[in-house]
Every structure is written in structure tokens, then in C-alpha cells.
């Protein structure tokens, strides 16, 4: 993978000139000049997904110049490097092969000359056998009762992905009740334990090293709670399984290593839902539906790795994102799913994007002088419309938005879905085209309003428009289409990282806080006044000690 400063390319310089020409062009102008704009700036993925990127401040020339940037930064070579098992995560000397986890074609993928697919398939088969025993009731707890509840204990990628997917695919869930515990705040585990019965609960402890502070603190609390009821430590093996590679620590915890599900160092945490970390997904929706999830992602992998940049959906979305982030100065992107089951999708890709591309040092080790990852946030529609859309419509920040919705709902109650989708369509239209002063004035005149009131109120009712959006319309949210959608965003993030010349698959930014917390923890064990930090941190710790009693 080449290390190219994007700002030093001819394409970047051309884009800077092009931006000067485009900065005052409106989306309304672009539509007025081209009646075929939708057909030119939208694309389908099979019969599952329509991506409409026509309501953006782009022309065919913009896209051509952005694609030139991708070529100069050797995006094609980087894609090949990832899919072939090259160790593109150089700061950790690791391959990046979440694509191997969903490689349904089973074509060999090599790491250090060894095909990883036999091991991937072996773990999948083990997940299948285990999950079928739990779901069928064949697996019994220590009192002979079947499992009714599953508690996944993990954090970051070991929590966000499985939680997001099990929520998004709730229409496919079986009788098992799923719970997720991540926060080291004791409230999180305490509230979940109030809801479950030790005789019928299975705990999944998701930690590659089996040393993650938050996860192991929660796991030991769950174990203590369980043993208060079960008594004998030998019963732990019937109620705990591990998603880990540390067989020694897993065995010492009391878990039968036969119920330890492995994954590999080429699986990054925020890309791990496709691995053994997805066992909670399998237990929720069944193995066959999990395979459909993998198949949808694999289909997008094939699209990404074989489709030219001009028609490549992850590449197009990535390039448009760079256009706004680096030329228009937009610092943020909103992900707005119009589907309540998808309520954790934005949070999942908040980690996926910000932990991947939130870097200020390039692949050469130099501090960058351009923008890297955007701030990602969002909530489901229509809730967001009554919360933060005001700023998107009439604020001073540019917030490019992705609107996501299914054409077919899993809950066809009355006309709920038509009302939901009418808002989905209306919002992107309103953001793009706005509402002029002339229209507002005419509305007031038609209502017979007092002219003095009109002059005062009109400025507040004007919508400038020209706010960019993408619309992603799914036929229906199924395991297959969700898998494809997740992979679409994963590859968008990778594409941006390649072009921005940063390492997307490490996350050193999480380390310093952990190191300092480990230093502070012993200082909280007693009531002695602390003076070993800066005055602010000392003051906070000492007030905490005074107040805790």
C-alpha cells in the first residue's frame, strides 16, 4: 500500500480550483439544468438497495476529479492489498481480513502463506453446533432447565456490533432474550442481573485477551452473582462461554475451553461482528440468518473489489465525503435511519468511522495539514426531526446527511410506514431546495396576515436549502441487505483512510486514558489527599474522596 500525501497530488490541486468554481452553485441550480440528474447520480445494488447521491453539491466533473484523486492515491492497489492478506495495519504488523470472515465463495485467502479459510469455517461450524443446542433447549443449565436469556459481556466492537445487529434484526429473533452489558459502571450489569434467572441464563464473555478491564470486571461480577445461587464452581461451565484466544485465562475463570470461540489478530474489534464475536447474533436470529448476514456483506465485498470507481458505491460515498470534509470544511456527517429497529446503526458507525479515521498522523508518521475523519452522529427518524434537524435546516454548520429507509416495513400498522416514508422523502427535498422568501411571503399574503407581521416574521421562515444528502433506500431490512449495508459503510471508511494516507485499522488513541486510569485506580483505594497530578485532576480526585464518605 503506497503512502501518498493527497494534498500533493495533481488531482487535489484540480479539486481545489474546481471547488472555487462550485462553492456558490446550488443543488437547485444543478437540478434545474439537468432533468436526468437522478438517473445520472444514483445506482442500485442488485434488487436490494438504491443509493441516490443526486442531492449533493457535485457534477460529473466533480466526480471525475475525485476519481482521479482515488487513482493517484492508488486506491485500487490498496483494495487488492487488503483482500490479499497483506499486513496493511503496519503499526501492529497485522493483516486486515474481516472480508475473510464472510468469504462465502471460500476462495483461499492467505496470511503469511497460510489459507485462513479452513479455520474460519471451523469456528463457524462450532458456532452453529453450539447455538443449535442452546436454541433447541438441548443445552441445559445446572438445574436441568433450558436457557432463556443470553447476556453478552463486552465493550467497543465486542458490544456495539452485536447489539446493533440483534436490534436491527429483531423481526428475525427467536425465543431467547438478549441482553448486552458493556459499561464498567456497576449500574449496567446490576440492572441486567435484575431481569434474569441464574438457572436459565448464559453469559458470553467477549474479550480477545480475556484481560479487558471493563469486560472482565463485569464478567467476574456476573460469575459472583451466579455462584451465589449455583454454589458449586463446576456449574460455571454450563452458563458461561468465551469469545477469546486466551485459553489459559478462560479455563481459570471456569469456562470449558470447548466453549471458547476463537478469532484472530487480523480481525479488528470494530469489524468483528462477522467473527465469533457475533455469537450473540447467531443465538438471537439463528445460524441460517447469520449466514445470510455474511452473504450480504460478501456480495458488497465483491462489488467493492471488482467494480470500477465510477460505479463503486462505497468509493462514491467516500469521495463525496472527502469533498465536503476537505473542501467545504464540513466537520460532521449525520446517519439518519428511518427504521426504529436501526436505532443503534449511527452509534455503531460512530465507532466504526471515528476510531478508524480519527488520526492526525499520516502513514509516513507526519502530522497532517488536512482534515481526516469526520464526527459521526445520528438518531432514527422521525425522532431526530423533533430534536436536531432545526440546526441541519437553518443552522450555520454544513451537515451532510445519509438518510436510510426500507421500502417494506416489518410492522405494517395502519398507515404508519407511509407517514414515516413521506417524512423520509420530504426531508431530503427540503434540505436540498429549501423555501425562498418569495414563497414565504406569498403564503402569508394568502393567509391574510398583517403586512407588518409579514415583514418581521418572514426571515425566520426562509430555508436556504443547498444542504447535501444521500438517500439509501432498501427494499426491506433483512439479514442479507443489512450485511450489505454494513459492508458498504466499512468500505467507505477504508477508502477514505487510503486516500487520506492514514492507518484506518489501529486505535492508539484509546491507550493513554487507559494507562492513566490504571495509575489513578490505586490512588482511589484510601482517603489520602492526592497531589501527584495537575491541580485540576488533584482537585477532582480529592473532592471525590471527600464526597464518597
UniProtKB/Swiss-Prot annotation:
Catalytic activity: alpha-D-glucose 6-phosphate = beta-D-fructose 6-phosphate
Pfam short name (any one): PGI
SUPFAM superfamilies: SIS domain
Associated pathway: Carbohydrate biosynthesis; gluconeogenesis; Carbohydrate degradation; glycolysis; D-glyceraldehyde 3-phosphate and glycerone phosphate from D-glucose: step 2/4
Predominant subcellular localization, coarse grouping: cytoplasm
CDD domains associated with the record: SIS_PGI_1, SIS_PGI_2
Recorded family membership: Belongs to the GPI family.
Protein name: Glucose-6-phosphate isomerase
Recorded name of the encoding gene: pgi
Amino acid at each position: 500500500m503506497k503512502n501518498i500525501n493527497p494534498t500533493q497530488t495533481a488531482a487535489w490541486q484540480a479539486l481545489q480550483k474546481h471547488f472555487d468554481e462550485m462553492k456558490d452553485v446550488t443543488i437547485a441550480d444543478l437540478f434545474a439544468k439537468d432533468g436526468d440528474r437522478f438517473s445520472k447520480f444514483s445506482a442500485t445494488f442488485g434488487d436490494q438497495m438504491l443509493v441516490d447521491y443526486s442531492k449533493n453539491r457535485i457534477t460529473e466533473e466533480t466526480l471525475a476529479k475525485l476519481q482521479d484523486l482515488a487513482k493517484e492515491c492508488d486506491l485500487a492497489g490498496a483494495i487488492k492489498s487488503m483482500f490479499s492478506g497483506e499486513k496493511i495495519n503496519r503499526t501492529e504488523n497485522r493483516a486486515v481480513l474481516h472480508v475473510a470472515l464472510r468469504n462465502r465463495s471460500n476462495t483461499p485467502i492467505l496470511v503469511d502463506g497460510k489459507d485462513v479459510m479452513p479455520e474460519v469455517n471451523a469456528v463457524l461450524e462450532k458456532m452453529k453446533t453450539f447455538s443449535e443446542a442452546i436454541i433447541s433447549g438441548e443445552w441445559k443449565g445446572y438445574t436441568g432447565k433450558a436457557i432463556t436469556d443470553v447476556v453478552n459481556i463486552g465493550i467497543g466492537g465486542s458490544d456495539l456490533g452485536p447489539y446493533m445487529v440483534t436490534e436491527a434484526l429483531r423481526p428475525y429473533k427467536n425465543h431467547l432474550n438478549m441482553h448486552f452489558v458493556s459499561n464498567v459502571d456497576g449500574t449496567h450489569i446490576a440492572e441486567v442481573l435484575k431481569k434474569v434467572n441464574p438457572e436459565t441464563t448464559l453469559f458470553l464473555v467477549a474479550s480477545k485477551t480475556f484481560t479487558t478491564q471493563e469486560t472482565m470486571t463485569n464478567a467476574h461480577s456476573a460469575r459472583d452473582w451466579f455462584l451465589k445461587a449455583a454454589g458449586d464452581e463446576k456449574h460455571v461451565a454450563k452458563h458461561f462461554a468465551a469469545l477469546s484466544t486466551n485459553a489459559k485465562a478462560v479455563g481459570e475463570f471456569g469456562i470449558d475451553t470447548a466453549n471458547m470461540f476463537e478469532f484472530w489478530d487480523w480481525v479488528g474489534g470494530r469489524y468483528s461482528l462477522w467473527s465469533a464475536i457475533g455469537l450473540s447474533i447467531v443465538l438471537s436470529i439463528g445460524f441460517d440468518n447469520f449466514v445470510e448476514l455474511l452473504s450480504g456483506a460478501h456480495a458488497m465485498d465483491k462489488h467493492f473489489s471488482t467494480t470500477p470507481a465510477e460505479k463503486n458505491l462505497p468509493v462514491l460515498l467516500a469521495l463525496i465525503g472527502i469533498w465536503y470534509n476537505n473542501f467545504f470544511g464540513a466537520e460532521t456527517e449525520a446517519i439518519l435511519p428511518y427504521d426504529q429497529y436501526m436505532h443503534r446503526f449511527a452509534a455503531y458507525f460512530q465507532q466504526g468511522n471515528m476510531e478508524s479515521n480519527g488520526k492526525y498522523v499520516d502513514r509516513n508518521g507526519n502530522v497532517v495539514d488536512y482534515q481526516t475523519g469526520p464526527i459521526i452522529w445520528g438518531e432514527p427518524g422521525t425522532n431526530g426531526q423533533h430534536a436536531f434537524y432545526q440546526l441541519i435546516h437553518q443552522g450555520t454548520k454544513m451537515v451532510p446527511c445519509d438518510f436510510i429507509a426500507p421500502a417494506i416495513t416489518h410492522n405494517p400498522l395502519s398507515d404508519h410506514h407511509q407517514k414515516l416514508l413521506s417524512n423520509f422523502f420530504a426531508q431530503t427535498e427540503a434540505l436540498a431546495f429549501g423555501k425562498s422568501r418569495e414563497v414565504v411571503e406569498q403564503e402569508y399574503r394568502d393567509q391574510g396576515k398583517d403586512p407588518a407581521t409579514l415583514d418581521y416574521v418572514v426571515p425566520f421562515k426562509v430555508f436556504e436549502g443547498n444542504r447535501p444528502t444521500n438517500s439509501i433506500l432498501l427494499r426491506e431490512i433483512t439479514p442479507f441487505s443489512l450485511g450489505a449495508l454494513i459492508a458498504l459503510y466499512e468500505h467507505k471508511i477504508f477508502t477514505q483512510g487510503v486516500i487520506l494516507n492514514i492507518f484506518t485499522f489501529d486505535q492508539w488513541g484509546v491507550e493513554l486514558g487507559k494507562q492513566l486510569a490504571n495509575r489513578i485506580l490505586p490512588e482511589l483505594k484510601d482517603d489520602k489527599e492526592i497531589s501527584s497530578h495537575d491541580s485540576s485532576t488533584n482537585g477532582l480526585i480529592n473532592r471525590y474522596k471527600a464526597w464518597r464518605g
